């Protein structure tokens, strides 16, 4: 492998693949590093596998296959099973099959995608409790959640991924005992102002409606305004407890799938010192980037859901814009040529971002989900409870690393 490249991309999801295609179309040398064994990221995981294809929306499947095909034919250097563990300036340290390597680049495009919002709750460490994203990965990889399809599965939380997962579970013949909806009613009421913009993207709204109808037709009981969710059991999950309409109730469950939305992966940006911004509605940090994904650090871009969660279609466009701008930055193409190549993607992205603003409120997390009992484990590795963290903050330790030091 070359020790230097024009562009190194981290992440082979829709944004990373599109960025590679865009940069290569301008003649740049490109190396793409990804920890998975095949391209696609989380959204298009195993898209080249017939098993995964069977679970995907036909339009997304065909678009994903075309994107992967374009990437494989682009001439970019593809390094699967690469774990990036260090970055100094624009020099990356990574390992492939436990062999350390280094690679420098004139431009770095981070495309880490999004991650499930971590929300601890009583009993979340019990066997049988999973995140919705992990469950969907298991299904796409040919696994099953339970040995018995009639074993009750409970969904809990808020977010479009739960709609998608519910459809996949129903298609697989899994019995969904209930969906405990934890969404914020007040924020959903605020979404009305953004509804007209959402109408600019009928296919996306149509997809959401189809997923919702699939859940309704599947007879899944939806319990609104569920609070105080707890996983109960001795050695593994046996029941799920929740509060609704002033009463506490229990449901038998073999599996509990919890999900409270997708947020950007900002760990690398944060470690590098790139400027971050706070979203008060979605209650998450995201990188401060311009229209092309440029961060506050020279030569560092963030593309896709790692910049802000707008979904797969928007991620492709963000990746394309970052790849084109990387070529402009190196002087390989003129600003005018960059503008011409980016114009179509900009127009489409503007529509998608406006439409996604509606979902920002519809699937906003309710702050009450973070109000967990003191005995709730927050860090299972160090056995740190919510109460220990609150005690540290009350004693004046307000910086994250300080809290980690005094509670570990």
Each language-model region and where it sits:
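Residues forming the flavin
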Residues: 1-407
């Amino acid at each position: 492998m070359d020790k230097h490249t024009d562009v190194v991309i981290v992440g082979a999801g829709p944004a990373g693949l599109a960025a590679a295609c865009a940069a290569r179309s301008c003649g740049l040398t490109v190396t793409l590093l990804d920890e998975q064994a095949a391209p696609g990221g989380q959204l298009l995981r195993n898209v080249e596998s017939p098993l995964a294809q069977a679970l995907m929306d036909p339009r997304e499947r065909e678009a994903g296959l075309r994107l992967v095909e374009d990437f494989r034919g682009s001439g970019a250097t593809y390094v699967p099973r690469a774990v990036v563990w260090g970055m100094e300036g624009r020099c990356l340290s990574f390992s492939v099959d436990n062999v350390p390597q280094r690679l420098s680049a004139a431009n770095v495009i981070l495309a880490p995608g999004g991650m499930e919002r971590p929300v601890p709750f009583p009993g979340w460490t019990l066997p049988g409790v999973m995140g919705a994203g992990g469950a969907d990965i298991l299904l796409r990889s040919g696994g099953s959640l339970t040995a018995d399809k009639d074993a009750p599965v409970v969904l809990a939380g808020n977010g479009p991924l739960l709609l998608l997962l519910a459809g996949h579970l129903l298609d697989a013949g899994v019995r969904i005992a209930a969906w405990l909806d934890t969404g914020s009613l007040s924020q959903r009421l605020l979404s009305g102002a953004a509804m007209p913009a959402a109408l600019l993207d009928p296919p996306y709204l149509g997809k959401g409606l189809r997923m919702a109808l699939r859940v309704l037709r599947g007879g899944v009981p939806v319990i609104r305004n569920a609070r105080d969710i707890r996983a109960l059991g001795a050695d593994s999950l046996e029941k799920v407890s929740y509060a609704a309409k002033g009463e506490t109730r229990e449901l038998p469950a073999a599996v509990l799938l919890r999900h409270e939305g997708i947020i950007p992966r900002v760990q690398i940006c944060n470690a590098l010192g790139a400027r971050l911004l706070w979203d008060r509605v979605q209650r998450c940090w995201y990188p401060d980037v311009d229209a092309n994904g440029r961060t506050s650090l020279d030569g560092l871009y963030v593309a896709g859901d790692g910049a802000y969660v707008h979904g797969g279609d928007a991620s492709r466009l963000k990746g394309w814009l970052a790849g084109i701008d990387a070529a402009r930055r190196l002087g390989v193409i003129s600003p005018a040529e960059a503008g011409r190549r980016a114009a179509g993607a900009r127009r489409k992205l503007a529509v998608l971002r406006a439409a996604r603003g509606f979902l920002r409120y519809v699937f906003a997390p309710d702050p009450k989900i973070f109000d967990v009992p003191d005995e709730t484990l927050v860090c299972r590795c160090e056995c740190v409870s919510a109460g220990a963290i609150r005690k540290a903050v009350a004693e004046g330790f307000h910086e994250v690393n300080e809290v980690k030091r005094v509670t570990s």
